[in-house]
Amino acid sequence: YRPFDTEDFDAIALILQQLWHNNSDNDEYNRLEAACDLAYCLSSSTFSQVAVIDGEARGIALARAGQNSGVTINEHWMDTERALLSQMRELEPDACAEYLSFVRATIRTNNRLLESSPLPHDNEVTLLAVDRDVHGLGVGTVLLDAAVSHLSSLGATRAHLYTDSNCSWKFYELHGFKRTATHRANREERRHDMPRESFLYELDLTA
């Protein structure tokens, strides 16, 4: 286990592609979409931990502590995200437009979830993804613990994350997170491939 290195990018993006970015018949487009998602997550995170097995990156946890993230790193990944979006538009304009609609709907939903909770808007686990081939080996637990420990070490009293009915939300409950808000997708949101239910989970770091 170690911090994210730029050389991990392609391997981690492939994990995200296999988990969440496989809607298009065009594999190259799916690859770009997953890479774009990863770049976005990296741009808004201040902590990273990667699981390396046999020299290969097989999982990642990202977290954001407070609002003062490193500007240079953020700008690099934001530029990367913009460049990937441009390639996506050229390759599959309709699929790209649908992806952007999904992203906007997700952001709106997450904001609604947070507004309905007394949580502060910082100290978030922004990404947790593990290669399906190593599920069940405890990799996700180590990565999540690393992210939460990092937030706690900086004085955070609570951490939060977003997940949904398409993901392994029970995993977070097993690790002490409690569901504090739920959003059920309406017909319009379902049309944009939004999950049936989206959840906000929080963890008390003082316990």
Which residue stretches match the model-derived regions?
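A short beta-loop-alpha structural element at the N-terminal edge
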Residues: 1-14, 25, 65-66
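Active-site rim helix/loop that mediates acceptor-substrate recognition in acyltransferases
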Residues: 26-53, 58, 62, 83-86, ...
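Conserved beta-strand-loop-alpha-helix junction that forms the acyl-donor binding cleft
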Residues: 126-135, 160-170, 185-189
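Conserved GNAT acetyl-CoA-binding A-motif
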Residues: 122-123, 151-164
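Conserved N-terminal entry element of GNAT/NAT acetyltransferase domains
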Residues: 1-7, 18, 58, 203-207
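Conserved acyl-donor/pantetheine-binding loop and adjacent beta-alpha core of acyl/acetyltransferases
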Residues: 67-123, 187-194
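Conserved acetyl-CoA-binding loop-helix of GNAT-fold acetyltransferases
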Residues: 130, 136-149, 174
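Conserved active-site alpha-helix within GNAT-family acetyltransferase domains
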Residues: 111, 141, 165-182
